Design a protein with these regions (language model features):
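Conserved Class I SAM-dependent methyltransferase catalytic core
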Residues: 104-161, 165
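Mobile active-site "lid"/loop adjacent to the S-adenosyl-L-methionine
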Residues: 80-109
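Conserved SAM/SAH cofactor-binding pocket of Class I
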Residues: 1-89
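Residue-level detector of flexible, active-site-proximal loop/helix-junction positions
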Residues: 64, 154-157, 172
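Residue-level detection of beta-strand scaffold positions
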Residues: 8, 14, 55, 123-124, ...
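SAM/dcSAM-binding transferase cores
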Residues: 160-206
């Protein structure tokens, strides 16, 4: 399958997807990022891991992703800025502010581009803070992407959600499934599910 990661930063998500231990790594991954410094680091990591045939870092504005094919991808992933413009970015550096606040793009920009890149029936995977959940769902639907699966992220079992994961389908029918909380930590460190994502397997104890 073909994947495009928006707001990819230094390319952590594409690199994790292509770990050798992954059972079904994507055939092709585009990583879109607007910050030149981040793309330089991304390029370096791709070269050092011999993944140039699979991962394609792209320096561009996601609002106008030049060189990225439309209606081509099976999956679009994105970890977008969480906070609205004006909510504290004056205290941050330009790079930090752009990563955390909607200065260079907002939720509607993300949804518009995601819809243009996905094949019909393709999936969008997005994470956001719970405060913006309504904004995400409304924007997804307005751009033809139907929310299908939602999962809250907690540090430990019974904790308060600090992040929400949402999967939507382009052209999908209404109906959403709520999964059990994703627990980042267990008593012995990372949870089994967290280890599966990062390492492709459960970590041995002891």
């Amino acid at each position: 399958h073909k994947v495009c990661d928006l707001c990819t930063g230094c390319g952590i998500v594409p690199l994790i997807m292509c770990r050798n231990i992954s059972k079904k790594p994507p055939k092709e991954i585009y990583g879109i990022e607007i910050m030149p410094e981040a793309v330089k680091l991304f390029d370096k990591s791709v070269a050092e891991n011999n993944l140039s045939d699979r991962i394609k870092p792209v320096l561009c504005d996601l609002k106008d992703p030049q060189g990225v094919p439309r209606e081509y991808f099976d999956i679009v992933t994105v970890n977008p800025p969480y906070w609205k413009k004006g909510s504290g970015e004056e205290r941050l550096s330009d790079v930090q502010a752009a990563a955390r606040h909607e200065i260079l793009c907002n939720i509607d920009d993300v949804m518009k581009t995601s819809a243009s890149l996905l094949k019909y029936g393709g999936s969008l995977k997005i994470c956001q803070i719970p405060l913006r959940l309504a904004d995400v769902i409304c924007s997804m639907r307005s751009h033809g992407i139907e929310p299908k699966v939602m999962q809250n992220v907690v540090n430990r079992k019974g904790g308060k959600p600090w992040l929400v994961l949402i999967s939507g389908k382009k052209g999908g029918k209404p109906g959403m499934e709520l999964l059990p909380d994703f627990e980042v930590y267990s008593d012995s460190g990372y949870s089994d599910e967290m280890n599966r994502i990062y390492y492709g397997t459960k970590m041995k104890k002891g």
